[in-house]
Amino acid sequence: MPDEINQPRYWDSIYKEPDEPRWVLGQAAPPLTHWLKSAKRQLGRVAVLGCGYGHDALAFAEHGFDAVGYDFAELAITRGQERVVPLHRGGRLKLVRADFFELPATESGRFDYVYEYTSFVAVAPERRQEYAQMCHAILKPGGMLVGCFYNHGRDGGPPFDARREDVLRVFSPLFEIKKLEVSEHSIERRKGHELWAEFVKK
């Protein structure tokens, strides 16, 4: 399985199934919506990793951020461009088919924010340190990683469990941990299992 999930065809095959993938909410993730509305945020450029159809990227754009959503699955990007991008009229939303592990080669230090939601748990566990390094590399000095880590407590994956101690072990060498706590705003099936994160690049 770990080798298979490193290939875009694996993720495209899931999008081709009759039912939508379970990670497609049809709206922005409620913890993100709360964060965007709860206080005035400094605007900037945000990378939305594993963006799917782009609902979270759309939420950022609608709040004035310049949002670039990246996804490995071509079908996810195609559907997002058809269904979600037309909902935004401000010119601040872009969806790109890409392997986010390759972003440091072209996007080093170009983002004020990185947004994480379901990507960390989709990555093979042996690549988690590489994932954290990628997030660090594409952020500007003092840039912030925000989002949720899915601590579901089950064996196997994807999604692979994101235990709090594992998240801290991977990210704390590269980021100052401002917040990592259970979100009070998760959808029903994830209540109590999503850790809201706010990390600042060291």
Regions of interest found by a model, annotated:
Residues Y115:
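A conserved beta-strand element that flanks and buttresses the S-adenosyl-L-methionine
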Residues P2-V48, Y53-E107, V123-K202:
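Class I (Rossmann-like) S-adenosyl-L-methionine-dependent methyltransferase catalytic domain
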